[in-house]
Amino acid sequence: TKCYVTPDVKSETCPAGQDLCYTETWCVAWCTVRGKRVSLTCAAICPIVPPKVSIKCCSTDACGPFPTWPNVR
């Protein structure tokens, strides 16, 4: 599987056994100004995340691109 991976946000081949791509997003103090924080990576399983953290898992090549947000102003 090939997944987008941060910080470079480029598609990379995942290590053996990690066949899922996931996009994890969450807010910090500057969320309303800068938008959500984003982590893109490979995984063996879709992780369980704490409250207020969003995660999307998928299993096809390059299926988890960097999310786009509406302009916040």
Curated annotation (Swiss-Prot):
Disulfide bonds join C3-C21, C14-C42, C27-C31, C46-C57, C58-C63. This is Long neurotoxin 3. It comes from Ophiophagus hannah. SUPFAM superfamilies: Snake toxin-like. Expressed by the venom gland. Belongs to the three-finger toxin family. Long-chain subfamily. Type II alpha-neurotoxin sub-subfamily. GO terms for molecular function: acetylcholine receptor inhibitor activity; ion channel regulator activity; toxin activity. Keywords: Acetylcholine receptor inhibiting toxin, Disulfide bond, Ion channel impairing toxin, Neurotoxin, Postsynaptic neurotoxin, Secreted, Toxin.
